[in-house]
Amino acid sequence: MKKLFATILAFLLFLAQVPVIAEPSAINCKVAEINTYGHAVLDITDEDFYKAGFALGDIVTVTAGSYTGDMPCFNGYYVDREATLVYINPFVGSITLGVNYGSFVNLSGVGKGDAVTIAMKEKGGVLDIQEVNNLVYSDERADFASDEVFANFRPVVEGKLYRSVSPVDNRIKRARTADNLIREAGVQTVMNMVNTDEEIVELMAADDYDSPYYRELYEAGKVIALEMSIDYTVKAFVEGLVEGFTFLSEGETPFLVHCLEGKDRTGFAIMTLEALMGWSEEQIVADYMKTYSNFYGIEPGTDRYDLIMEKNIEEMLRYMEALQADTSTSETDLKTAAEAFLRENGMAEEALKRLEAKLASE
């Protein structure tokens, strides 16, 4: 009995010396700015966030404005449409309260200077989702197989329609490469889905601007600046799409469609144009997913590939067709659906037919 008592006592003494890992204290911070997407950028950095004991894959409880709720912490928008998240930008280290394809400001009423509290809800609660989706790419040309892969540049229809990263905005260090490629392709008309005219002028005045061909096109009136939201479900996006397509219909081929990365906004626009050209669902999906191969090395047959395909391009197709979320897009005529989508949103019949004719195979 004495031996048993001594053993228990020793074990209890051991436990008393084991350090207890304290739950991170809540972070009290403020909204530094509201970005162009209506999301709240905080006045703390990722370094502050990590030092406080929080990490990617955690679930936290956020209080901001009229909003109190639980959010996952991700370095990408790995949540369903209209779901909230704490977005930890892997490139600039900012912390943002966001809504996927929505506005956190509209949800919470929060404004610049307002107080925000972040508290731990569940450590590592969504770490598996973070690890599957962790999409971070290099800005070094040497890490990519070719200039085309680096600039996410490719022909949709050789000699008629191309897509790429921005040749004017050098934030992701690819503008000059893209500019060289569009010059070699002989691009004549550009649909810029992300910038205003004022922003383009500012970008061309920047010290690191080195895209002479884009400047030439812009100064010749061959670039339309649309400043479109990333949310393709809002009216302004579709209005911008129709305006951009009408501009292309009046321009000379080859066309270029781009945003910043040539991924989301460009993805929806190109999807619609491919549908107009009679592409199958399989062809459209394969082209869209090529961007994820270029940037992140994500290939068919992987969990990441299937997840991104389901959450992104297949949802885009369903939206264009106004289908229920559980309806197969392969059951519909995509060309007819794309034409109806554009007509219903204000594209003139003459412009639509002119665009289709310019994209048609010779």
Regions inferred by a protein language model and the residue ranges of each:
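Residues marking helix boundaries in flexible regions
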Residues: 9, 22, 64, 165-166
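Sec-dependent signal peptide cleavage junction
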Residues: 15-24
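Long, compositionally biased stretches
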Residues: 23-99, 105-119
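Active-site cradle of extracellular carbohydrate-active enzymes
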Residues: 256, 260
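Ser/Thr-glycine-rich phosphate-binding loops at phosphate-binding pockets of nucleotides
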Residues: 261, 265-266
